From Swiss-Prot:
This is ATP-binding cassette sub-family C member 2. ATP 1 binds at residues 671-678. Its main location: membrane. It holds the Pfam family ABC_tran. Glycans are attached at residues 7, 12, 1011. Belongs to the ABC transporter superfamily. ABCC family. Conjugate transporter (TC 3.A.1.208) subfamily. It comes from Homo sapiens. InterPro entries: AAA+_ATPase, ABC1_TM_dom, ABC1_TM_sf, ABC_transporter-like_ATP-bd, ABC_transporter-like_CS, ABC_transporter_C-like, MRP, P-loop_NTPase. It catalyses: ATP + H2O + xenobioticSide 1 = ADP + phosphate + xenobioticSide 2; an S-substituted glutathione(in) + ATP + H2O = an S-substituted glutathione(out) + ADP + phosphate + H(+); taurolithocholate 3-sulfate(in) + ATP + H2O = taurolithocholate 3-sulfate(out) + ADP + phosphate + H(+); leukotriene C4(in) + ATP + H2O = leukotriene C4(out) + ADP + phosphate + H(+). Keywords: ATP-binding, Cell membrane, Disease variant, Glycoprotein, Lipid transport, Membrane, Nucleotide-binding, Phosphoprotein, Repeat, Translocase, Transmembrane, Transmembrane helix, Transport. One of its GO terms (cellular component) is plasma membrane.
Length: 1545
C-alpha cells in the first residue's frame, strides 16, 4: 500500500546488506516524516490547553520570539512553494505520487500549529517549550536520513528532483536555526531565577547556571550572588499545599484511631480506655507526659497516637514530582542495559572482519547516543529527586515550627528545646535524604532482575553461582554493619560525654583558671578521647573488612561464574563477547546489590523519624476556649469559678478562682513559693488546661515573664518587638525602665548586639528590657510575673514609680503584678493573696492589715528578717496599738529622689555626689539627647564604633582555596611514613587491577587458539587460578591500604584534638569573653567529627578514584596509543570543569552552613519564648521570619544541588566522549585489534564516566572537609596566657603572711581598649579584712582578676609576701589563692570531684570542710554521700547549696588570701548569714578581700576601698569614712542606713 503511495519501494533488507547501506526513500518520506509530525499533533492539544488554563499575563514581544516566528513563517512559505511545484508537475503528463501532495500539506498545517503554539506561549509568559524543542530535535534527527540520501543522489548525478532537494535543504537549515534559537532563553526581568525561564536545552545541560559558576570561580560567592528559588519552591507555597493534605490525612488517622479504640473498648466488655475523655480531642492520646512511667504503672496502658498519615500527606502533595522522576529513572535503567548489548556487537564486529564498517560506526554512535540519553535522564531524575527532598524538608521544618506555636503545654512537656530542634534538623534531614533515593527501591529490584536475565543469556545457569556469591555476601555485610553500628553507638556515647564536659569546661572556664584546675579537666577529656579513638580505630578496622569483602565480591563473582561456566561443560570456552559483556553486566549488578540493603536501612531510619514527626505534628493544640475575649465587657478581667491544671490527670493548680479586675486597676498577687501566682497568669494567657469555669478578658494583653526572654538581636529590636518606631514613646520607655545608663555603657548603645539569650547582659538588664518591650507596646492589660525580682531594690522602686505605679507610664492600664516586694503594696489598688492555688484573701492594703489575717502575719515576718537596709527605715512603733501604723509606715517610707539613686547605683555614681540631684538631672538630659541622636543616625553610629567595642567578635569565615599549608599540616599529623605505605598499597591495587584485566583479555584470546575439544585443562586451570589470585591481590592491597590508613587517620585525629584542647585551656580569658561558647564547642564537635570520620573517607575515595581513572586511561592507551591524542583535550576539559565547580561548590557549602544555623537558632529562641509570643499575638510575624530564614537557606541548598548537576552532566559528557572515541578507535583500527582487546578497552571505558564524576565530588568533599582542619588550626594558634609553671617557683609555704602590695597597677581587658584600672597603689596588711565597693564598671571585679592574673598588667606590679606575681607561673600563683565567686559554678561529677578534683585531700578533711560549710548533714543524708552525682551546672542542688559547696572548696585549700567576689549577691538571707559567719570564724587568720554588693557585709572590715573609674577615690575604716560626707557616706545613706554613726553590724 505504501509502495503505491510513494510509487517506490517502501522496505527491502537488501538496502542494508551492502558496504554503503541506505534506507529506501519511501520509508524516509513517510515513517521518518510522520513520526515528528505525529508527536506534535498528538501532544499539541494538551499543550494549548495548559496555555489556555494559565493565568499569567501577556509578556512583551522579544527579538528572539520574532526571529523564531519569522523562521517558521519561512518554513510555511517553503511548504506552500513545494505544494505549488507538485501541482505544476501534476498538470503535466507525469504522474506525481500521493506522498508528494501529502507531505507539503501536512507541513503547512504543522507550521501553522507551531506558529500558534509559539504565540500562545509568549502570550502566557512561559519559558521556551520543551515540547517544541523535542519536536525540532526529532524532526532534524529523522530528516538526517533523507538529507544524506538526497546528497548521495545528487553526487551520483541524478538531478531529477533538484528543486525538491533544494527546498528540503533550505527547510532543513531553517529547522536547525530554529533549534539553535530555542536553546536561548527569553529575557524576563520579573524572574529572580533563570531556571524558571531557561530553554529546554539549557535546562537539560544546566547552562543557565554558567554565570554562577563563573562568578564563583572569579571570587567567593556571597548570599546576594545566589538566585532566589522559584515561587513553587518558596516555603509559603509548599506549606500551604502540604498543610491541606496534612490536615485531611491527620483527621482520617484520628478517626481510624478512634474506631480502633472503640472496637477495642467493646471487646474489653465496655471497659473504658484510660486517657480518653469525651471532653478531649482524640489526638490527646498522642501525649506522653514527663512522668509517663509512673502513669503507666497506674493505668497499665499506653496511649496511642495517629499513625501512618505523614507519608500519605507527603505523597499527595508531591505525587506529580514522584511520577516524573519515576519515568525518568525507568528510561535510565532501560538504557543502562543497552550499553552491554552494543559492547557485545562491537566485540563481534571486531572479531568478524567481514562485517560492514558502517555497522561499527553505527554501534559507536548508538553507544554514545544511549549514554547521552542515560546521562540526561539520570541528571534530570536526580535534579527532580533532590528538589523534592528540599521541598519535603522545607514542608516539614515549616510545619514543625508552626506546630510549635500552637502546641499545648501538655504536649510540649514531652520535648526539650533540643529535642524539638532535632525534629527540624535531624528528622527533617533524614526524610530529605530518603526522598533523594527512594526510587532506588524498585529500581534496584528491576536492575537485578534485568542483569540476571541478560547474564543468563550469556552464561546460562552458571550465572547462578555468581549471584549466589553476591547473595552470600549480603548477610556477611549485614553482620559487619551490625557490629559497626554497635561500635558507633558506643562511640557516640563517649562523644556525648566528652562534649558535655567540654561544654562545662568552657562555661566554667573562669573557675578552672581561678583554682588552677585545667590539668584535671584536661585529663578527664583526654581519657574520654582515648576511649573514643579506641572505638574509632575498631570501627575503621571493621570497615577495612567491609571494604575488603566489597572489593573482593566482584572478582569472586566473576571468578566463580567463569570457573563454573568452563568447568560444567568442556564445550564452554570463554570468549571475549561472553567475558566482557558479563563483566559489564556484573558491574551494573554490583550497584543495586550494594544499594538495596542501604536503602532498606535508610527507610527504617526514616520510619523512626516519621513516627517522631507524626507524634509531634499530631499532638494537641493549645485549647484557649476557656479564655473569652469580649470587647464590650464591663470589666477588664473576670475569673468565674476558674480552675486550671498543667496536666489532665493531676489536681488543679489554680482552683475555683473568682476575681473581678476593673479597667485601670493595679492588682498585686502575692503568696508563698508554689502558691500558684505564676500559674494564675499562665491560665489567663491560655497556657494551662481548663478544668472548669472560664476567664473573660477585655482588650489586648502584654506579658512580662519571671524569667526574661530576650531575642538575639539589638536592644532596640527587643524593645520594639516588630512594632513601628515612635521616638517619643521609645525615649520615655528607656528612661522609665532605667535603661539609659546601661545604654551609655554598652558599645553601640541601643544598637548593641546582646547575643544569644541576652548573654552579654546581667539578669537585671534583661528583666528591664523585657519590661520595656511590654511597656512600649502600649496595650490594654499587663500581666507582670515578678518583674522586679532580678533588680536592685532601689532600681525596683524607680521602675515601680516610673512604669508600674499610679503615676507610671502604665497608669490607666490594667496591671496584674505578681511580686515578693512588700514595699509597693500600699500603692496598689487591690491585693490578692494566694495559697495552694486558691484566693486566701483579697482587698486593699489597709483592709487586709485591719483583718490581721495571713497577709498581716506574713508582713510582720518579712520585716523581722529584712536586712539592715530595710531595717533602718522601720518606724519605731513601741506601743502595741501602733502595730498596724508601724507596718504601714515601714513599707511606705522610701528614700528621696529614687531616680537619682537608681542612676547613681547602677552606672553614674560620680565623685561630686553632694550635688547629686542637679548633676544627675543634667546627665540624664544629655544622655537622652545623645541617645536620640544615636537613634536618628543609627547607621552612622554603628559604622563609627570604636575599634574593639564589639562585644562578640564575628566568626571569621575563610574564603577561596584552602591554603596548602593546611593540607601539609594534616599530612604531617598522619605521618609521612604512613602516607608512603598507604599510597604504595593503593598503587599496587591498581597494578593488580590492570593485571587482572589484561589476564582476562589473554584468557578470552584462548578461544581463537583452542576449540572446545582440545582446550587443555592445565591451561584452563592456570587461567582461572591466576585471575583469581590477581583479584585476591586487589582485595589484600586495598585491605592493607585501609588498615594502615586507619592508624594514620586516628593518629592525626588524636594530635589535632590534643593540640586544640591544650591550646584552648591555655587561652587567656579575653578569648572566652569575645568568643561564644557554641563556636568553640563546634570545633570540638563538628570539626573534630569531620576529621574523625568524613575527611578520611573522602581522602581514601579520592585516591581510589584517581588511580582508577589513571589505570583505565593507561589500559586504553596501551591498546590504542593514538587514543592519547584524544585524552589530552578531554583531560583539559575535565580539569577546567573541576576547577570551576570546586570553587563554587566550596563556597555554596559554606553559605549553606552559615544560613542553616539561624533557622535552628530562631526556632530554639521561639520555643523558649512561646508564652511571650502568644501573649503579644505575634505568631504570624515569627512564622514570616521563619519562612524568610528557610527560603534563604533553600536558595543556597538548591544552588548547591544545581551545581552538582551542572558538574555531573559535563563530566558525563567527558566520560561519554571517552567511550565514543574509544569505540571509534576500535572501529577505525579494527584490522590491528582483536575482539578481546576491544572488549577489554570498552568494558573499562564504560566505567570511567562514574569514576570521573566521583573524583570531582571527592575533590570538592576534601576541600570542604579540610576546612575543619583549617578551623581547628585557627584555634591551635590562639595566643596563650603566661606559662602555668616556670623555672622561678615561689617558696613552698608562700604566701605565709598574706601581705599584698599594689604599686601603680594598671590593666586593660584587651590591647585596643582603655585602661580599667588606672594606677592602683595600696598596701593590704597581713590578715586584714578589706571591703571593695564602687559602682558598676568601677573596676572591682577587675581588681580580683588581676590578683589571679586573669588580666595581665599593662603597668605597675602586685607583690604578695615579697614576690612579684608576674614573675612566677600562673598555677603557682592561683593554687595559693582562694576565691568564692559570685556565681557558684559546679561541674557534672561527684561531690568529691567538685571539691577536690586532684584527690589531694583525705575524706576526713573533706567532711571537716563540709561541716564548717554547714553541708555535712545534707551530704550525709545522701545515699552516695561524697560520691553523689552532681548534674550539669549543679542543677540538682539549690543555689544556696551550690554557694556553700564553693565555700567548702575555699575551706579545703586553707589559703592565706581569700577573695569574695560578691559571693552572697544571689543567695537568700539565711545562706548569706551562714557564709558570713563561717568566713569570720575560719578565715580570721587570713587576708580577706570582699567585693561588696550588700553594704552590711563589709561594715565590719578593717578597711573599705572605694573605687571609681579604675581609681581608688577613698580608703579607710568604715567608721572613718562614715564621718566624712564622701562617696562611701552617700552610698550608705542611699542604702537606707540613716543612723550611720551608731550602726553596728
Amino acid at each position: 500500500m505504501l509502495e503505491k503511495f510513494c510509487n517506490s519501494t517502501f522496505w527491502n533488507s537488501s538496502f542494508l546488506d551492502s558496504p554503503e547501506a541506505d534506507l529506501p526513500l519511501c520509508f524516509e518520506q513517510t515513517v521518518l516524516v510522520w513520526i515528528p509530525l505525529g508527536y506534535l499533533w498528538l501532544l499539541a492539544p494538551w499543550q494549548l490547553l495548559h496555555v489556555y488554563k494559565s493565568r499569567t499575563k501577556r509578556s512583551s514581544t522579544t527579538k528572539l520570539y520574532l526571529a523564531k516566528q519569522v523562521f517558521v513563517g519561512f518554513l510555511l512559505i517553503l511548504a506552500a512553494i513545494e505544494l505549488a511545484l507538485v501541482l505544476t508537475e501534476d498538470s503535466g503528463q507525469a504522474t506525481v505520487p500521493a506522498v508528494r501532495y501529502t507531505n507539503p500539506s501536512l507541513y503547512l498545517g504543522t507550521w501553522l500549529l507551531v506558529l500558534l503554539i509559539q504565540y500562545s506561549r509568549q502570550w502566557c509568559v512561559q519559558k521556551n517549550s520543551w515540547f517544541l524543542s523535542l519536536f525540532w530535535i526529532l524532526s532534524i534527527l529523522c530528516g538526517t536520513f533523507q538529507f544524506q540520501t538526497l546528497i548521495r543522489t545528487l553526487l551520483q548525478g541524478d538531478n531529477s528532483n533538484l528543486a525538491y532537494s533544494c527546498l528540503f535543504f533550505i527547510s532543513y537549515g531553517f529547522q536547525i536555526l530554529i533549534l539553535i534559537f530555542s536553546a536561548f532563553s527569553e529575557n524576563n526581568e520579573s524572574s529572580n531565577n533563570p531556571s524558571s525561564i531557561a530553554s529546554f536545552l539549557s535546562s537539560i545541560t544546566y547552562s543557565w547556571y554558567d554565570s554562577i559558576i563563573l562568578k564563583g570561580y572569579k571570587r567567593p560567592l556571597t548570599l546576594e550572588d545566589v538566585w532566589e528559588v522559584d515561587e513553587e519552591m518558596k516555603t509559603k507555597t509548599l506549606v500551604s499545599k502540604f498543610e491541606t493534605h496534612m490536615k485531611r490525612e491527620l483527621q482520617k488517622a484520628r478517626r481510624a484511631l478512634q474506631r480502633r479504640q472503640e472496637k477495642s473498648s467493646q471487646q474489653n466488655s465496655g471497659a473504658r480506655l484510660p486517657g480518653l475523655n469525651k471532653n478531649q480531642s482524640q489526638s490527646q492520646d498522642a501525649l506522653v507526659l514527663e512522668d509517663v512511667e509512673k502513669k503507666k504503672k497506674k493505668s497499665g496502658t499506653k496511649k496511642d497516637v495517629p499513625k501512618s498519615w505523614l507519608m500519605k500527606a507527603l505523597f499527595k502533595t508531591f505525587y506529580m514530582v514522584l511520577l516524573k522522576s519515576f519515568l525518568l529513572k525507568l528510561v535510565n535503567d532501560i538504557f543502562t542495559f543497552v550499553s552491554p548489548q552494543l559492547l557485545k556487537l562491537l566485540i563481534s564486529f571486531a572479531s568478524d572482519r567481514d562485517t560492514y564498517l558502517w555497522i561499527g560506526y553505527l554501534c559507536a554512535i548508538l553507544l554514545f547516543t544511549a549514554a547521552l540519553i542515560q546521562s540526561f535522564c539520570l541528571q534530570c531524575y536526580f535534579q527532580l529527586c533532590f528538589k523534592l527532598g528540599v521541598k519535603v524538608r522545607t514542608a516539614i521544618m515549616a510545619s514543625v515550627y508552626k506546630k510549635a506555636l500552637t502546641l499545648s503545654n501538655l504536649a510540649r512537656k514531652e520535648y526539650t528545646v533540643g529535642e524539638t530542634v532535632n525534629l527540624m534538623s535531624v528528622d527533617a534531614q533524614k526524610l530529605m535524604d530518603v526522598t533523594n533515593f527512594m526510587h532506588m527501591l524498585w529500581s534496584s529490584v528491576l536492575q537485578i532482575v534485568l542483569s540476571i536475565f541478560f547474564l543468563w543469556r550469556e552464561l546460562g545457569p552458571s550465572v547462578l553461582a555468581g549471584v549466589g556469591v553476591m547473595v552470600l555476601v549480603i548477610p556477611i555485610n549485614a553482620i559487619l554493619s551490625t557490629k559497626s553500628k554497635t561500635i558507633q553507638v558506643k562511640n557516640m556515647k563517649n562523644k556525648d560525654k566528652r562534649l558535655k564536659i567540654m561544654n562545662e569546661i568552657l562555661s566554667g572556664i573562669k573557675i578552672l583558671k581561678y583554682f588552677a584546675w585545667e590539668p584535671s579537666f584536661r585529663d578527664q577529656v583526654q581519657n574520654l578521647r582515648k576511649k573514643e579513638l579506641k572505638n574509632l580505630l575498631a570501627f575503621s578496622q571493621l570497615q577495612c573488612v567491609v571494604i575488603f569483602v566489597f572489593q573482593l565480591t566482584p572478582v569472586l563473582v566473576s571468578v566463580v561464574t567463569f570457573s563454573v561456566y568452563v568447568l560444567v561443560d568442556s564445550n564452554n570456552i570463554l570468549d571475549a563477547q561472553k567475558a566482557f559483556t558479563s563483566i559489564t553486566l556484573f558491574n551494573i549488578l554490583r550497584f543495586p546489590l550494594s544499594m538495596l540493603p542501604m536503602m532498606i536501612s535508610s527507610m527504617l531510619q526514616a520510619s523512626v523519624s516519621t513516627e517522631r514527626l507524626e507524634k509531634y505534628l499530631g499532638g494537641d493544640d493549645l485549647d484557649t476556649s476557656a479564655i473569652r475575649h469580649d470587647c464590650n465587657f464591663d470589666k477588664a478581667m473576670q475569673f468565674s469559678e476558674a480552675s486550671f491544671t498543667w496536666e489532665h490527670d493531676s489536681e488543679a493548680t489554680v482552683r475555683d478562682v473568682n476575681l473581678d479586675i476593673m479597667a485601670g486597676q493595679l492588682v498585686a498577687v502575692i503568696g508563698p513559693v508554689g502558691s500558684g501566682k505564676s500559674s494564675l497568669i499562665s491560665a489567663m494567657l491560655g497556657e494551662m488546661e481548663n478544668v472548669h469555669g472560664h476567664i473573660t478578658i477585655k482588650g489586648t494583653t502584654a506579658y512580662v515573664p519571671q524569667q526574661s526572654w530576650i531575642q538575639n538581636g539589638t536592644i532596640k529590636d527587643n524593645i520594639l518587638f516588630g512594632t513601628e518606631f515612635n521616638e517619643k514613646r521609645y525615649q520615655q520607655v528607656l528612661e522609665a525602665c532605667a535603661l539609659l545608663p546601661d545604654l551609655e555603657m554598652l558599645p553601640g548603645g541601643d544598637l548593641a548586639e546582646i547575643g544569644e539569650k541576652g548573654i552579654n547582659l546581667s539578669g537585671g538588664q534583661k528583666q528591664r528590657i523585657s519590661l520595656a518591650r511590654a511597656t512600649y507596646q502600649n496595650l490594654d492589660i499587663y500581666l507582670l510575673d515578678d518583674p522586679l525580682s532580678a533588680v536592685d531594690a532601689h532600681v525596683g522602686k524607680h521602675i515601680f514609680n516610673k512604669v508600674l505605679g499610679p503615676n507610671g507610664l502604665l497608669k490607666g492600664k490594667t496591671r496584674l503584678l505578681v511580686t515578693h516586694s512588700m514595699h509597693f503594696l500600699p500603692q496598689v489598688d487591690e491585693i490578692v493573696v494566694l495559697g495552694n492555688g486558691t484566693i486566701v484573701e483579697k482587698g486593699s492594703y489597709s483592709a487586709l492589715l485591719a483583718k490581721k489575717g495571713e497577709f498581716a502575719k506574713n508582713l510582720k515576718t518579712f520585716l523581722r528578717h529584712t536586712g539592715p537596709e530595710e531595717e533602718a527605715t522601720v518606724h519605731d512603733g513601741s506601743e502595741e496599738e501602733d502595730d498596724d501604723y508601724g507596718l504601714i509606715s515601714s513599707v511606705e517610707e522610701i528614700p528621696e529622689d529614687a531616680a537619682s539613686i537608681t542612676m547613681r547605683r547602677e552606672n553614674s555614681f560620680r565623685r561630686t555626689l553632694s550635688r547629686s540631684s542637679r548633676s544627675n538631672g543634667r546627665h540624664l538630659k544629655s544622655l537622652r539627647n545623645s541617645l536620640k541622636t544615636r537613634n536618628v543616625n543609627s547607621l552612622k553610629e554603628d559604622e563609627e564604633l570604636v575599634k574593639g567595642q564589639k562585644l562578640i567578635k564575628k566568626e571569621f569565615i575563610e574564603t577561596g582555596k584552602v591554603k596548602f599549608s593546611i593540607y601539609l599540616e594534616y599530612l604531617q599529623a598522619i605521618g609521612l611514613f604512613s602516607i608512603f605505605f598507604i599510597i604504595l598499597a593503593f598503587v599496587m591495587n591498581s597494578v593488580a587491577f590492570i593485571g587482572s584485566n589484561l589476564w582476562l583479555s589473554a584468557w578470552t584470546s584462548d578461544s581463537k587458539i583452542f576449540n572446545s575439544t582440545d582446550y587443555p585443562a592445565s591451561q584452563r586451570d592456570m587461567r582461572v587460578g591466576v585471575y583469581g589470585a590477581l583479584g585476591l591481590a586487589q582485595g589484600i592491597f586495598v585491605f592493607i591500604a585501609h588498615f594502615w590508613s586507619a592508624f594514620g587517620f586516628v593518629h592525626a585525629s588524636n594530635i589535632l584534638h590534643k593540640q586544640l584542647l591544650n591550646n584552648i585551656l591555655r587561652a587567656p580569658m579575653r578569648f572566652f569573653d569575645t568568643t561564644p561558647t557554641g563556636r568553640i564547642v563546634n570545633r570540638f564537635a563538628g570539626d573534630i567529627s569531620t576529621v574523625d570520620d568524613t575527611l578520611p573517607q573522602s581522602l581514601r575515595s579520592w585516591i581510589t578514584c584517581f588511580l582508577g581513572i589513571i589505570s583505565t586511561l593507561v589500559m586504553i592507551c596501551m591498546a590504542t596509543p593514538v587514543f592519547t591524542i584524544i585524552v589530552i583535550p578531554l583531560g583539559i576539559i575535565y580539569v577546567s570543569v573541576q576547577m570551576f565547580y570546586v570553587s563554587t561548590s566550596r563556597q555554596l557549602r559554606r553559605l549553606d552552613s552559615v544560613t542553616r544555623s539561624p533557622i535552628y537558632s530562631h526556632f530554639s529562641e521561639t520555643v523558649s519564648g512561646l508564652p511571650v509570643i502568644r501573649a503579644f499575638e505575634h505568631q504570624q510575624r515569627f512564622l514570616k521570619h521563619n519562612e524568610v530564614r528557610i527560603d534563604t537557606n533553600q536558595k543556597c541548598v538548591f544552588s548547591w544541588i544545581t551545581s552538582n548537576r551542572w558538574l555531573a552532566i559535563r563530566l558525563e559528557l567527558v566520560g561519554n566522549l571517552t567511550v565514543f572515541f574509544s569505540a571509534l578507535m576500535m572501529v577505525i583500527y579494527r584490522d590491528t585489534l582483536s575482539g578481546d582487546t576491544v572488549g577489554f578497552v570498552l568494558s573499562n571505558a564504560l566505567n570511567i564516566t562514574q569514576t570521573l564524576n566521583w573524583l570531582v565530588r571527592m575533590t570538592s568533599e576534601i576541600e570542604t572537609n579540610i576546612v575543619a582542619v583549617e578551623r581547628i588550626t585557627e584555634y591551635t594558634k590562639v595566643e596563650n596566657e603566661a606559662p602555668w609553671v616556670t623555672d622561678k617557683r615561689p617558696p613552698p609555704d608562700w604566701p605565709s603572711k598574706g601581705k599584698i602590695q599594689f604599686n601603680n597597677y594598671q590593666v586593660r581587658y584587651r590591647p585596643e581598649l582603655d585602661l580599667v584600672l588606672r594606677g592602683i597603689t595600696c598596701d593590704i596588711g597581713s590578715m586584714e579584712k578589706i571591703g571593695v565597693v564602687g559602682r558598676t564598671g568601677a573596676g572591682k571585679s577587675s581588681l580580683t582578676n588581676c590578683l589571679f592574673r586573669i588580666l595581665e598588667a599593662a603597668g605597675g606590679q602586685i607583690i604578695i609576701d615579697g614576690v612579684d606575681i608576674a614573675s612566677i607561673g600562673l598555677h603557682d600563683l592561683r593554687e595559693k589563692l582562694t576565691i568564692i565567686p559570685q556565681d557558684p559554678i559546679l561541674f557534672s561529677g561527684s561531690l568529691r570531684m567538685n571539691l577536690d578534683p586532684f584527690n589531694n585531700y583525705s575524706d576526713e578533711e573533706i567532711w571537716k570542710a563540709l561541716e564548717l560549710a554547714h553541708l555535712k548533714s545534707f551530704v550525709a543524708s545522701l545515699q552516695l554521700g561524697l560520691s553523689h552525682e552532681v548534674t550539669e551546672a549543679g542543677g540538682n542542688l539549690s543555689i544556696g547549696q551550690r554557694q556553700l559547696l564553693c565555700l567548702g572548696r575555699a575551706l579545703l585549700r586553707k589559703s592565706k588570701i581569700l577573695v569574695l567576689d560578691e559571693a552572697t549577691a544571689a543567695v537568700d538571707l539565711e545562706t548569706d548569714n551562714l557564709i558570713q559567719t563561717t568566713i569570720q570564724n575560719e578565715f580570721a587568720h587570713c587576708t580577706v578581700i570582699t567585693i561588696a554588693h550588700r553594704l552590711h557585709t563589709i561594715m565590719d572590715s578593717d578597711k573599705v576601698m572605694v573605687l571609681d573609674n579604675g581609681k581608688i577615690i577613698e580608703c579607710g575604716s568604715p567608721e572613718e569614712l562614715l564621718q566624712i560626707p564622701g562617696p562611701f557616706y552617700f552610698m550608705a545613706k542611699e542604702a537606707g542606713i540613716e543612723n550611720v554613726n551608731s550602726t553596728k553590724f
